[in-house]
Regions:
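Conserved segment of the helicase C-terminal RecA-like domain
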Residues: 126-135, 139-170
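Conserved nucleotide-binding/hydrolysis micro-motifs of P-loop NTPases
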Residues: 3-8, 59-60, 83-85, 109-111, ...
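Long, largely alpha-helical accessory region at the distal end of helicase-like NTP-driven motors
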Residues: 25-27, 31, 35-38, 44, ...
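Short glycine-/polar-rich loops that comprise or flank the Walker A/P-loop
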Residues: 72-75, 116-120, 146-151
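SF2 helicase motor core recognition
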Residues: 103-121, 137-142
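Alpha-helical scaffold elements adjacent to nucleotide-binding pockets in ATP/GTP-utilizing enzyme cores
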Residues: 68, 91-94, 117, 132-139, ...
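Conserved helicase ATPase core of P-loop NTP-dependent helicases/translocases
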Residues: 53, 61-111
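Conserved interdomain linker/interface between the two RecA-like ATPase lobes of SF2 helicase motors
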Residues: 1-58, 170, 176-177
Length: 232
């Protein structure tokens, strides 16, 4: 809660036509080298060597993240609305085949993208939209042979607004506007939390690891929750 990036996010005042944070203001505040360095540090600390997707604010932000990650040894590409369709298809296929380690995108993979062996999701784009949050983390929850977990690296504090993806929510109250789409974050969570999604059938587990909150739930349980809104 006291991280530099979280203080910057807490100061965002402008809203877009959809009621979410204004992209221009987010980009001005967070598309800077110190913030990108912290994004890189989180990947190296928690997901080093893993295959993942990063959600960026803007085309410039995505390209700057990819450039920095490549500079420091992570094979990374950025994909956005300006990427030609054939090139996008080629890059995604290379990612699926393991030729690319990290894909940075701008609202391309929020929905309709399937790459089951994604090992981590990094949230680098603040949002006030619960559906967008759940769509983003959902990209890493596909089950595949040999996949033990998917890590959620939340650098922008979305868990503080919405809770972990597994949090119980009063959907009726949200639809009625009484909760404004807010979740129920745990008081024990940290600014950069991560969640491993097990494919096993063990009951939910939580543990503190290196000062970070780790939540492990069965793969089927979490997918069922995201699809139906049922409590885990």
């Amino acid at each position: 809660p006291d991280s530099e990036d979280q203080r910057l996010i807490n100061g965002l005042e402008r809203r877009g036509a959809d009621g979410d944070f204004q992209v221009k203001e987010m980009d001005t505040v967070l598309n800077r080298r110190p913030s990108i360095e912290r994004l890189y540090g989180s990947v190296r600390q928690y997901a080093d060597g893993k295959k993942g997707i990063v959600y960026a604010i803007s085309i410039s932000h995505a390209r700057n993240i990819a450039g920095y990650y490549n500079q420091y040894g992570l094979n990374t590409v950025a994909i956005d609305s300006k990427t030609p369709a054939n090139e996008r298809k080629r890059l995604v296929e290379n990612f699926r085949q393991g030729k690319i380690q990290v894909l940075v995108n701008v609202d391309i993979f929020s929905e309709g993208f399937d790459c089951p062996d994604v090992e981590f999701i990094q949230l680098a784009r603040p949002t006030l939209s619960l559906p967008k949050y759940l769509q983003q983390v959902g990209r890493g929850l596909r089950k595949t042979e040999g996949k033990e977990s998917c890590m959620i690296i939340d650098n922008v504090g979305l868990y503080r607004l919405f809770g972990l993806p597994t949090a119980h929510r009063d959907w009726l109250a949200m639809f009625e506007g009484r909760l404004s789409g807010k979740g129920y974050p745990s008081t024990n969570t940290r600014p950069v939390a991560y969640m491993a999604v097990s494919q096993g059938t063990d009951k939910d587990k939580t543990a503190e690891t290196d000062g970070q909150l780790e939540t492990i739930v069965s793969h089927g349980q979490l997918l069922d929750y995201l699809q139906s809104g049922k409590s885990l």
